[in-house]
Amino acid sequence: MKKESDSFNRIKLKNKIQGMLEDTLSKGTVSIIAWLAVTMILTVVVFSFVLVLMNLRPDNETGSLSLIEAIWQNFLRVIDPGGLQNDRLWGYRIVSAVVTLLGVLIFGALVGVLTTGLDNLFIEIRKGKTEIVKKDFTLILGWNPTIFKIISELVISNANHKNKKIVILSKNDKIKMEDEINLRINQKELLKNFYNSLDGKSHKTYQTKIYCRSGSIIDIDDLNIVHPENAESIIILSSEEDREDINTIKCILALRKKAKKIITEIKDEHNKELMDFCFQNEKNQNILYIPSEKWLSRITAQASRQPGFSVIATEILNYDNDEIYFSKIGKELIGKTFKEISLNCVTSIVLGICKKNLDKNNLKEIYQKEMAEGKLSGIQKNIILNPYEKFNNNIIDGENIGCVIEEGDELILFQSDDGYPEFHFEELKIEKFQWKSGTEDVILPKSKTLILGYNKRIYKIIDELYEYVSVDSEVHIIAKMDKEVEKHLKDNLGYENVKNEDITDYRISEKEYIEEKFNLESYESIIILGYDELETQEKDAKSMLTMLLIKKMLEKNSKSSLKEKSIVIEIYDEKNREIVELTEVSDYIISDTIISSVISQLSEEKRLYYVFDELFSGEGCEIYMFSADNYIENFDREYTFKQLSTIVANEETILLGYRDMDERVEKKNDYGVHLNVNKNKKIKLNKNDKLIVLFEGGNEKNKKKVI
């Protein structure tokens, strides 16, 4: 019985030692190195005692080695096997040989462990699971085709600032993300081309550091890798599969307590209302929802009514030329009127003002009413675009002054950089020109629009189209869609003249049918949309094929061409831009580019959201192009841009620029669009040229100008 007990105890002790050894070794490279170090020390010490006790020496000298000397000698044998050749006595040689062999084994194992440890470290680095310990960076969560445009815009925005950083977290492989970014974005070349297009001069610029990490944007542990609480702003990108905004909403819920500022695209506006309701009791609302479908629909509809509008929208939204900035007011401007500042700002367009203190009672009744209905969110934040139209009691000596500038106010500027604008104050008297309008009654025109293709934005596009045309206007659709769509359009939008001709595919072989069924010459505008269910390249290819078909059919009749017809094509990949430009189509909407430009700008200045929302939501100020002969009568002379701005200001409107219609198909001249012209520049206009203005298009008194 005692033998069995001793045997059991030995087995138990053996298992304990084995378990302890396995536990420590399983902890990784550091614990293995520690065990090898202990083994080496024990080997050196044990055999040092052997040398001392057996009185062994490497030579014939008398006297035994001290323990310290023996340890040193054995340590040298462990790290340097070549020392054996100096040993003379066989007893010492045998001990040294054993120590050396054990040392070779230990160091061999150590090298193997270190190599494996480094390999594992590199694997972990490749996995992108190491923590980000940076601060004040822009965090991008998710990955979709817009990310390259967003990064490019941020790189340009950061060009004048040191140590700017972008951190990206997505489910993609870290190395693949880095390789793709480096392949698509050459920062040095990007900045060089940007400043060459701006002023042709060389500038000292700084590149932005980009860090990629792999993980799920809805996993708390993965989010902690990038420390979202240290980010200046967070951009959430929705995937093409996330049509219901599910992952976006989950990510917002995970981040809302940590993030300083979140910018995200919301595809379904009902989700925005839901999120607003969930967070209504929170004091700090730090989330900006971009209603991409609404804004893109508005831009598409406007482009179909105003050829060239997409060029204007793109220039306003991206960093390539001028941008919108909020600028603090200098002491010299306090007490001056908005009109004075607007007309005498030489290098910038003053779009509006952000009031430090805004008495809502000073606003016109229509704006107070719209604010009560939850519209014009910008005014809720004291952001006033085109003050000429919004304030009561702003007429002094028969002149609309907009408002008086007070201490703490900020100007909303459209200019080339974020520097302080240049002012040159001087009196400029311009005889007020009577706007040419055929009638005082607002009579909306009847029009015909042809839409080729279908996606979920078609409802909003049609709704926007009918805002400035009569209800008996016709919209014809040629597309493959569900049978319920036409009924849905009529029932929900209330437009009886919306009709769909369901053609499964508009191939070249069907052009005779289309030409016979639809007289293209009878349409004022044509819109080409991509199908949601198709891949990006397939969508663009189908849309471009349709455009070529339209081009061929129009030119066959020799009555008109793409240059003269208002044709808007929606494309998704910016790389297809150059192909579209070859067709001389009047407008193209690059959906992803527009949204990525908006996201990039909002990551730098969140108040721009309220500016863009007013410009592209159809509520408040809008951008329009009017024929120059609506403002001036004498086309034999030149006008400075300041003179033109003064003439336009007399109509309670802000002049943004002009469009030279002779340049409308010239890419190098931005298709004739000239924004933020120096106030001293002289311009000679033709009757068919357009003045680009910012005004309240929704007001009844202004609608006659639009039509």
Feature-to-residue mapping (PLM):
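Cytosolic regulatory regions of ion transport systems
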Residues: 1-707
